[in-house]
Amino acid sequence: EKVMNQLQDFENDCGNWLDNLLSSEMQKAEAAKEIKVHIDQISRLCNENPNIIDDHEIMAHGAMISSLILSHYLEECTKKNFILNSCHFMRLGLDRKPDIKYVKKNVEELMKDCPDVPILITQSRLCKNAYDEVDFFPQIGNEYYATVIGAVFHADEIITSLRSDEICFRGMEHTRTLTYGEAENFIDSGIALLHPECIPLARTVGMAIVLIKTPEDTLRISSEKTGTKVKAAVSRRGVVFVKLRSLGIL
């Protein structure tokens, strides 16, 4: 009963979000109807005995509701868009890493029937696993998921936020650049620039990664080489000096 009450509160919250985002009553009604389908599915799962797979399915319906709200908001802003259910193309292998070959094949088939629209919406981290169960990407950073999505959709570049507080920008340039190799050296030094597996994947498909710290400070990682001057300096705290004394023992 408590869960059902919480679910009703969630449905009411969705209605409030639609009221605040949308001005068209017709658009609100259509969005509410589509959201209701997913809420009913969540209710059905909650009435059964949820196991870990059911829990994933509940979260998947929540992700689709978020996509629907965004889609209807963009429609009202006259921005044509289309929702892609990431479970229809994204899959993890037995090693819990994305099965890139499988994903690319699915994307190619999916895009044949996809409307010609400028904006495609999908769900972050939602996928299927090797056993065809609803699952989620390992929590290793949204930038890695974005890199995988960009790679399989043949994107020229992806844009994500730079969350590390260890990165400080100096100088007048608004956009700084690093090559893939320079970025790897940065990451190897211990700086949390982005997930290490992003770089080799982006390099393989020739895709740039743009990291934004503030609207004025961006960092672009690509194959492009720019200049020979020093681009970055790494300063680490807690350096330990270790003195070794030989005991003369062989």
Indicate residue ranges for each PLM-predicted region.
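C-terminal catalytic "cap/lid" subdomain
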Residues: 1-2, 6-12, 16-29, 40-51, ...
